[in-house]
């Protein structure tokens, strides 16, 4: 597996393969790095300008430069394609970049057309480092061959420039070639300088890619250089050697750093070995004196590329170098439990020589390659602790790249970035890779703060971020007196004759900072009274001069000078204007640098130290009647009762709770009675028609999805207060599973201590009450025999062949308030007597949630029913059988009752479904009086009472958890059959009609006369002319009456 974002050559069957699988990565930002006007540098298109970056400060010049590697740039070397360059860029407004000439020659030959080296595509500039006048730049893909062999081998080469002298440095170009030696060394893949003027070079391809570290003295490299000698031996060289075969493919030298880890004052060598330990990855620390092993770190996840990047710096100020190790392919589980690539940096703090404590810092985005580059920044904000930058070159919007700035502190690295730098370029043929290379810890503009350069080789850019000077402010705020007496009104309120209770607010600023800060610093200061009150709430204190809770001021202080102070007077509003007397009044002071503050000598605007608060606050308290400590401790109690102990389900149930609230302790401020309302109830209001009950002010509100009634009990609710109040509720939304309704009551105040009473619950039981009735009617209720013109037919076919229509109607009605879910209705119908049919059922109909069945076939003779409504039919039948011929007076004893005890009855059984309050189920039974039976001689001249009966039984209620009593009843419906003459209506005498007409006319005449005397029929029109108006005047005054 090749590195994520680095070049590395490995042999494969059939030839060599160049692997560049991760030239794509992301960017970050620190709080005092200037992101408003960074210096942007552009290189030749497609040259990978920005692949490596560093600062350069030659002793022969007062100017600072940037060094930027462009490993795919074309050069003037004859016959060379993409030989690569290192450019020197001016840190001035011109931002001009010029290539540094290290090598102007083409390939050298053993003989004509027999080259010994191959400089095309050598990636010169893939690594660049400087130290004072010295610059080391390398081409890790430089190839050469020996005279005896034709294979090209990527040994790598470097050039070292010291002032005007430039020498080639190729420690892997030796006779020990091929894969088992240094033939695939790729020397210069990673490089660094030590303080003792040694060069450290990594060659991850040596010894079957075990890798190798090589260190030589700069002086010896320069002194021994001979352009005619291709393989130079150095006497003071330190180098790792080949190891056992199990260390093959480890990539020692993939990344390097230096630092003193054994306390001898000589910098030691740190190297990442990302494929060691079966791809877990390792980091080795070697002694800088003899290349012996000092310490090893091992990764915890396979293929995470632990050791891809390394850095060494003292992050916590204990004078021990700490180690930072990047693993950009590290995977962690997301919130969904799935593994995702986030990258990781291990921070190993050295607490004593060789004693490390490691913590992990995971990346913030998926596939961002967090940890691809790590750059020590020096003390970026001048707080006494070094800081560090970590790149995620493929993070951010559209993978433009991110660089995170983390600040050091005494406990180690702050895990939250103080600033995030974002790449500004969209991907073109490849991602911008902003942050793939970084270098810091150098003060380019000499303002006392180190700066940072970031490379984005995917868009051929490098960006210089300069650090802004940091201002540290010491702010003071005093409030006196801190206990405010509302009754001590001694300050005149401007513009009025009123006096108010007042207090003083004194605020001060002092500022200082390191570096080239301007002498005068301007601040925008804002003071806010009663800060903790929410927006829109009444602020209890105002400034006297502007009657506002806000005061804004521009203050000027001298850097490093004395504390600058000012004083204002504020006052309390009248106590009738606010309720909260208990909460402290917070006086809040906030400050920020004024934009008019001059820039420093380098043109950068100062910035406030973000690690010190930019505000300060103090508190004042309103004097309370709570003893010497001014702390009120109430003793709140609540009790509740009601005269209603039971509520019927379905009823509108008005419920009155009588609540007793009392305070047996010190004053309770903003005291409120809070009643939590159950979902079955609604608040109606406060009982106001009872003199014994307090008329509280109550409001309904919802808090955290709990419905509440909140009643004001006083501010304060003084010691010894007892209140009795009535609250009315309606309870009407009970569910079928409820057995009771519960109200929770408590008293709450804004006091700091004992501010809530014990919660009291009041429970009212639910009960079932269903007033169900059954009633019936016969239509008609009386039939007179004989039927005129009726003739017997042996096989009747129509209703007229049988007899008149008789309809019995039964209604089962639930008058509530509770519902029932199932009932049985039984109808007993007098069908036959002595084998003679009485009432022949044609059919029955239902209205409502009911299904019925009969135990005998209905209408077995298939009597035809005309298509007209039953009511009309019944009425018509009634007209058809009126008898007017004779009148027969019947004795009471001559009536024969034919009910189910005597007659044979047909039974209709109905299952009734749910009936809520006010709902009914109706059964219509349409029948015919079997006239033949009553026209028999033995049945004539008798009266009959035909009775049907209906009964019901409630068998189920919808209320599962409540006890239910059995509910049943019955009723009878009677149709009377009379043999005789229907009583004719008595005619009205003619004299009665005449007398009524005359009385009406007389009454009308009296009304007309009375209205005439009152002037009802007079109509005075408005005058059209002035004369008419004058003529009308006498009449209006009553001086004449023409009509009279």
Swiss-Prot record:
Ca(2+) 1 binds at residues 260, 262, 264, 266, 268. A motif (GFFKR motif) lies at residues 1015-1019. Keywords: Angiogenesis, Calcium, Cell adhesion, Cell junction, Cell membrane, Cleavage on pair of basic residues, Developmental protein, Differentiation, Disulfide bond, Glycoprotein, Integrin, Membrane, Metal-binding, Receptor, Repeat, Signal, Transmembrane, Transmembrane helix. Disulfide bonds join 89-97, 138-158, 172-185, 491-502, 508-565, 626-632, 698-711, 852-910, 900-905. Glycans are attached at residues 74, 290, 296, 615, 704, 835, 851, 869, 941, 969, 976. It is found in: Cell membrane; Cell junction, Focal adhesion. Gene3D superfamilies: Bicelle-embedded integrin alpha(iib) transmembrane segment (1.20.5.930), Integrin alpha, N-terminal (2.130.10.130), Integrin domains. Chain A, domain 2 (2.60.40.1460), ntegrin, alpha v. Chain A, domain 3 (2.60.40.1510), ntegrin, alpha v. Chain A, domain 4 (2.60.40.1530). One of its GO terms (cellular component) is focal adhesion. Ca(2+) 4 binds at residues 443, 445, 447, 449, 451. Disruption phenotype: Mice expressing a null mutation of the alpha-V subunit gene survive until late in embryonic development and occasionally even to birth. They demonstrate cleft palate, and defective development of CNS and gastrointestinal blood vessels. FG-GAP repeats lie at residues 32-98, 109-170, 173-225, 237-291, 292-357, 358-415, 419-482. Residues 1013-1044 are cytoplasmic. InterPro entries: FG-GAP, Int_alpha_beta-p, Integrin_alpha, Integrin_alpha_C_CS, Integrin_alpha_Ig-like_1, Integrin_alpha_Ig-like_2, Integrin_alpha_Ig-like_3, Integrin_alpha_N. Residues 31-988 are extracellular. Its main location: membrane. It comes from the Eukaryota. The chain crosses the membrane at residues 989-1012. Pfam families: FG-GAP, Integrin_A_Ig_1, Integrin_A_Ig_2, Integrin_A_Ig_3, Integrin_alpha. GO terms for molecular function: C-X3-C chemokine binding; extracellular matrix binding; extracellular matrix protein binding; fibroblast growth factor binding; fibronectin binding; insulin-like growth factor I binding; integrin binding; metal ion binding. Belongs to the integrin alpha chain family. PANTHER family: INTEGRIN ALPHA (PTHR23220), INTEGRIN ALPHA-V (PTHR23220:SF4). Heterodimer of an alpha and a beta subunit. The alpha subunit is composed of a heavy and a light chain linked by a disulfide bond. Alpha-V (ITGAV) associates with either beta-1 (ITGB1), beta-3 (ITGB3), beta-5 (ITGB5), beta-6 (ITGB6) or beta-8 (ITGB8). Interacts with RAB25. Interacts with CIB1. Integrins ITGAV:ITGB3 and ITGAV:ITGB5 interact with FBLN5 (via N-terminus). ITGAV:ITGB3 and ITGAV:ITGB5 interact with CCN3. ITGAV:ITGB3 interacts with ADGRA2. ITGAV:ITGB3 interacts with FGF2; it is likely that FGF2 can simultaneously bind ITGAV:ITGB3 and FGF receptors. The alpha-V (ITGAV) integrins are receptors for vitronectin, cytotactin, fibronectin, fibrinogen, laminin, matrix metalloproteinase-2, osteopontin, osteomodulin, prothrombin, thrombospondin, TGFB1 and vWF. They recognize the sequence R-G-D in a wide array of ligands. Alpha-V integrins may play a role in embryo implantation, angiogenesis and wound healing. ITGAV:ITGB3 binds to fractalkine (CX3CL1) and may act as its coreceptor in CX3CR1-dependent fractalkine signaling. ITGAV:ITGB3 binds to NRG1 (via EGF domain) and this binding is essential for NRG1-ERBB signaling. This is Integrin alpha-V. The gene is Itgav.
